[in-house]
Amino acid sequence: MTNEGLKLPSYSMLDLEGYLQPAGTPAQQIAMKNLAWTMLETYRTPDGGLGSRLSNEWLGEQKWYVQIIPHHQIMYEDSPWLLPLCLTLQEMRVFDILGTYVSPPAEDKSTVWQLKIDREQIGTFFNNYRMGFHLLYCQARRFAIHGNDGDYAVYAGSEKFIRAALPPIAVGSVATAKVIAGIEEEHGPGCMDGILEHYAPFMID
């Protein structure tokens, strides 16, 4: 059977078919998934599992910055933090928003969704993938938002993008410290040390 005849697994918590649209044929979705992985790498999580994160090589090549935020702030259809993101994407004229599951070992073949610039759709995407690693991006790779198991998300792109797409209180070292403190309170001290070390060269002060 060719890829044209396959229906790719979505790995979402709920069936999103009919609410979000697949980004083309299975073959086209696989191509879009491969594009996502040009920005990512796999790594060992603190519990010994295999996860994904934004690649330092990609971040450095693109001269991108990152900002870690609480995942719950973007996973509801009326999340206020999604409003500046939608406005920023509209101003950037980025209309081919894509979302997909990026938890290994499902690196290559899983549904890639086509999303509208809409708080309800974007919030629903982040909510339904909160139990794994997931990525919101566009075909031109002008930005990326990487979600991690419902604990946190990483906004990545130009400093201008990050500052425009998030509330001012969500940007900078003080905001990052608050996010880390909340995660460590739940999962234990030091659980974020590896992630902080990985993203340190690209964080906004």
Predicted regions and their residues:
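Structured alpha/beta or helical-core interaction and ligand-binding surfaces enriched in interleaved
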Residues: 1-153, 157-205
